[in-house]
């Protein structure tokens, strides 16, 4: 009975939200919306949405399951093929304070007008941008690991790949929303800068790995007050370059420069571990970090140690964030087309060091 009561409560609350959404839409369009061109539902559409909704509910994605059951046209009316990234309930209910218009924007931002299974996503190069149902807004495949068969979109982990695979609909579960939520902003959705806009391409539109100027990075660090970190990086540079060469899709790096290396000497066996923990395998400006959601992760040269973005207010965006417990105190100190250096407050901790 308790489970039923919980489901009924979810159904009731979302029904009210959808009612307000429908009424509000007739009065005013949100800033980033565009007219929806409906397509005719096939005879299989009702059963498709019902089957997908049941699958979501069984996997405890009850909020999205209810929305898909009550109003499938939100997700399925704009394209014959659809990929939906379902937000887990705990994160989804953090959106309860959003205006219904912006809630609809958020749902459209998590819906793609094409079918992409997990296999399809894993075949995409890191940095690939994908269109969404939200006008002029794209999401980015920020991390791809074919060995572990994991992927992240906008630095948000896909926790339930291929949760539903239908003839025209694919659903993946994600741990949180693809954008920080700003209930009082006229521009709710913050999209990533696509690497496809800034990186070199082959004639087949594939990303070309770049050569990182490590010597220049060491010189910049050394001449601007980060001597211990510069010495540490120089001491293990051969191993760092080897790491770089193993990332065939690497198009840039981010250096999180710490003012000290917790007294590690160049002979310390942990120096290499600490240094590579401070190097991210993509170029991220301060603005890129500020656009990330709470609990988003970023990859380092250490394949077993990701860094996590945390926010004091999960519904905020901007500079109120930390990276695995440290703050960026000197953002965008130095920047080139393939690297950026940020000064951080103190050395990142590594669990096993």
Swiss-Prot record:
Residues 83-181, 254-352 form the FAS1 domain. It comes from the Eukaryota. The keyword Repeat applies. Glycans are attached at residues 51, 81, 94, 200, 249, 315. Transmembrane segments: none annotated. The keyword Methyltransferase does not apply. One of its GO terms (cellular component) is extracellular region. It holds the Pfam family Fasciclin. Gene3D superfamilies: FAS1 domain (2.30.180.10). It is found in: Secreted. Keywords: Glycoprotein, Proteoglycan, Repeat, Secreted, Signal. Residues 1-28 form the signal peptide. May be a cell surface adhesion protein. Belongs to the fasciclin-like AGP family. This is Fasciclin-like arabinogalactan protein 21. It comes from Arabidopsis thaliana (Mouse-ear cress). The lineage of its organism: Eukaryota, Viridiplantae, Streptophyta, Embryophyta, Tracheophyta.
């Amino acid at each position: 009975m308790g489970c039923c009561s919980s489901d009924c409560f979810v159904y009731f609350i979302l029904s009210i939200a959808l009612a307000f959404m429908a009424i509000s839409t007739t009065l005013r369009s949100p800033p980033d919306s565009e007219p929806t061109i409906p397509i005719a539902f096939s005879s299989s559409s009702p059963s498709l949405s019902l089957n997908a909704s049941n699958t979501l509910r069984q996997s405890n994605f009850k909020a999205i399951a209810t929305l898909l059951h009550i109003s499938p046209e939100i997700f399925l009316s704009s394209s014959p093929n659809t990929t939906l990234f379902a937000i887990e309930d705990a994160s989804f209910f953090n959106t309860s304070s959003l205006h219904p218009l912006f809630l609809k924007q958020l749902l459209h931002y998590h819906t793609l007008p094409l079918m992409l299974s997990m296999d399809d996503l894993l075949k995409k190069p890191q940095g690939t941008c994908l269109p969404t149902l939200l006008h002029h807004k794209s999401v980015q495949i920020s991390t791809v690991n074919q060995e572990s068969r994991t992927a992240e979109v906008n630095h948000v982990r896909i926790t339930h790949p291929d949760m539903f695979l239908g003839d025209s609909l694919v659903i993946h579960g994600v741990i949180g929303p693809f954008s920080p939520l700003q209930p009082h902003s006229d521009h709710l959705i913050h999209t990533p800068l696509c690497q496809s806009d800034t990186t070199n391409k082959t004639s087949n539109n594939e990303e070309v790995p770049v050569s990182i100027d490590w010597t220049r990075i060491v010189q910049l660090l050394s001449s601007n007050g980060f001597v211990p970190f510069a010495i540490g990086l120089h001491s293990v540079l051969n191993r760092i370059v080897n790491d770089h060469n193993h990332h065939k899709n690497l198009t840039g790096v981010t250096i999180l420069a710490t003012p000290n290396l917790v007294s590690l000497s160049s002979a310390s066996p942990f120096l290499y571990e600490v240094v590579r923990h401070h190097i991210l395998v993509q170029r991220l400006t301060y603005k890129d970090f500020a656009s990330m959601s709470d609990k988003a992760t970023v990859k380092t040269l250490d394949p077993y140690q990701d860094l996590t973005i945390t926010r004091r207010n999960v519904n905020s965006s901007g500079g109120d964030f930390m990276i695995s417990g440290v703050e960026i105190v000197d953002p965008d100190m130095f920047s080139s087309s393939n690297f950026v250096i940020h000064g951080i407050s103190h050395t990142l901790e590594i669990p096993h060091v």
